[in-house]
Amino acid sequence: MKACGVAATLLALTAPPLFAQEPSVEKAGGYLSAFGGAVWTGGNSTGNAIFEGGVRIAPHMMIFGNIGHFADLQPDLQPSLDAAATALSSAGLGVTGGGTLPAWYGLAGVRAELPASKRAWPYVLGGLGAARLNPTQEFMFTSGTMPDGSMPDVGSDVTAALTSDGSLAAPQSSTALMLTFGGGVELPVVKRWVADVGYRYSRIAADSSLSADPLNTNAMTFGFGYRF
């Protein structure tokens, strides 16, 4: 019995230090994070990368800024591709259109932290900025006659030929207003380092040369951050 009592006493004395060594999310003056993940738009999915940093301005409030990249927001490009194919079809030329729409963006905003415990730090955020849209297009010949009277092989890329003779307008890069809302949770890994899992909704204003409607995206983000 005496041995049991000694063991219990030792356990009680050593337990606090052991628990104190468990990683926890420390309150910090700022953070730097890198994220990757998938973003869904118009029924399609693509990749998303974000580099972000923030500084504290109040006990549970930070301002943040980020730079990100969408790999391909193709659904926003499709209306202009369809319109071009329809116009060429009315002139007796059958083509199928495809393309890509990568976009870089930058945002600044406010992030509110919700300190639920030392083992997790939920947050919500909102930001406003701009997205730089860089469309590319590609049209393949299917039927009919080219403006110069030629008939390429089916499946031939006729984009350059149609652009050079003025039948097709080359897509132009443009900048559009973008806003984001979302949230996530930071989980401690080691001292000052955290894993970050979150969700972000973004809305990119309509570019009349690409689509008449704004583009909405839904992204899941996964990353790591350093709190300083």
Where do the protein language model's features map onto the residues?
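Solvent-exposed loop/turn segments connecting transmembrane beta-strands
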Residues: A38-G47, K118, S208-P214
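Transmembrane beta-strands of outer-membrane beta-barrel proteins
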Residues: Y31-G37, N66-G68, L125-G129, G198-R200
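Short glycine/proline- and aromatic-enriched beta-strand/turn motifs that initiate or cap beta-hairpins
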Residues: F19-I57, I63, G225-F228
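Gram-negative (and chloroplast) outer-membrane scaffold detector with strong preference
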Residues: Q21-E22, G54-D148, V189, T217, ...
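Short sequence motifs at beta-strands and strand-loop junctions characteristic
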Residues: G43-T46, G98-Y105, A169-M178, P214-N216
